[in-house]
């Protein structure tokens, strides 16, 4: 399941359903948001078509449903070179 924001960001950033699914199935969890509302969420990173992609997804365990919240390509301004660690800003 995709939130409207996720679909909009995928369209504007040319990120395909296949890339998002690849990251969800094969990506690495780099941040965990256990207290996110209404469902716990995670930030995953994965590669697709030569690009690094971040996917934020929540899990509604009662419906066994994954909800994609947003997806984007991490930028060097916000992420370290490995694209897994947020930069600290003064």
Regions found by a protein language model. Name each.
Residues 1-90:
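Ribonuclease/tRNase effector modules and their secretory precursors
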């Amino acid at each position: 399941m995709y939130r409207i924001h996720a679909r909009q960001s995928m369209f504007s950033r040319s990120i395909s359903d296949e890339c998002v699914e690849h990251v969800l199935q094969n990506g690495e969890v780099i941040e965990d948001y256990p207290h996110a509302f209404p469902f716990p969420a995670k930030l995953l990173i994965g590669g697709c078509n030569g690009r690094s992609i971040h996917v934020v997804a929540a899990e509604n365990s009662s419906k066994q449903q994954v909800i994609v919240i947003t997806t984007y390509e991490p930028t060097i301004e916000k992420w370290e070179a490995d694209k897994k660690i947020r930069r600290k800003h003064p």
